[in-house]
Amino acid sequence: DIVADILKWNYKELDFIPDVITASPPCATFTTMSLTNRNFYDKSKPARVRNSETMKPLNDYAILGDNLLKRTITIINYFRKKNPKLKFVMENPRGSMNKSPFMSALRPYETATTYYCMYSDTRTKRTDFFNNFNLKLREGSCRGTELVRLVPLCKRYAIPQTLITSIFKQIENNKIKS
C-alpha cells in the first residue's frame, strides 16, 4: 500500500511498475447530494458544490475534488503506458463522477455498478466501479439496514470485504487468461 497525498506524490519515482491500481477518489463532490441545495452528509461542507448540467465546480471544495480525480487518472494512465497489462479499478458512489469531463481521459474503461448490501453489508450504497477488465458485480437491488449518512466516517468509506475479494479474484483470473 502507498499512503500519500496524490497531489504531491511523485509517482514517477516509484521503484516498481504495478500490475493493479485501485483508487477511491473522495466522493463528496461527486455525490448526487452535492448537486442539490442541501448537504445531508456533512454540515460543515458547502451545500451545492457543482452545477448538475455542466459539472462545473462552484467552489474550492469541488475544485479540489476535480484535481484529485484528474491526478488519479493521470497516475493510472502513466502506469498503463509502462505496463499495458495493468488492471485498474476506481470506485465512487453512484453520482456524477461518470459525467465528469475528466473521465474521458481514462478511456477505455467499463463501469460496473452494484449495491453494497448485495455483498452482505448493512449499507445500501449503490457504487460505480470504473475498470479495464470486464468486472462483473452482483446485480439486483436490496435494502440495507443502515443509512450511510448515519454511519461513522471510517465505516462510511469502507468497501465490503466480500466485494474486495470478488474484485481481486476477477483481476487474478483475468491475469491468468491474458
Language-model segments: residues:
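Conserved active-site and SAM-binding loop architecture
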Residues: 1-178
